[in-house]
A protein has these predicted regions:
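Conserved acidic carboxylate
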Residues: 36
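Two-component/phosphorelay signaling modules centered on CheY-like receiver
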Residues: 39-57
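Acidic catalytic/metal-coordinating carboxylates
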Residues: 61-64, 87-91
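Short amphipathic alpha-helix used as the core "switch/output" element in two-component signaling
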Residues: 67, 90-103
């Protein structure tokens, strides 16, 4: 009886992994760059997106993010606005959206700045979506999926 339960559980795990991979097959080729200076949040976002099958890259400031854009050509950036160094997230977003040579990736701004004028500034800089911290993780996943599907067509 115990062996039967063990085999059933093993079979369920194998089936889950098979269907999970099939469900996420379209996302496997989507490259996402997370530009966030807080390592814990960057890691959390990475885990969420990797679980959904995305290929993830990370940067801790806008300069490193720009370097990674040149190197990996991401389909989408999850980008904080308030970053250390000379360039902030809005500057990087503007640069990405006005320079077709960089591939015109989709940009999701994820920031603590939630005033209407901040949101307007983010969208004016070219962001495709704007989320205020603390954000709903399911909402981020929905936005990322929608934007990745849109860029695939």
């Amino acid at each position: 009886e115990n062996r039967k339960v063990f085999l059933n559980r093993t079979l369920m795990k194998v089936l889950f992994l098979f269907f999970w991979q099939a469900k996420n097959k379209y996302t496997m080729s989507a490259r996402i760059l997370i530009v966030e200076d807080h390592a814990d949040l960057r890691h959390l976002i990475r885990m969420m997106l990797e679980f959904d099958g995305y290929e993830i890259y990370e940067a801790s400031d806008a300069s490193e993010g720009l370097e990674m854009v040149h190197r990996v050509r991401p389909h989408l950036l999850v980008l904080d606005i308030m970053l250390p160094g000379g360039m902030n997230g809005l500057d990087l977003c503007r640069l990405l959206k006005t320079n077709p040579a960089l591939g015109l990736p989709a940009v999701v701004l994820v920031t603590a700045r939630g005033k209407p004028r901040d949101i307007e500034a983010g969208l004016a800089a070219g962001a495709d979506a704007y989320l205020v911290k603390p954000f709903n993780s399911m909402k981020l996943l929905e936005i990322v999926k929608r934007l990745c599907e849109k860029s695939a067509h």
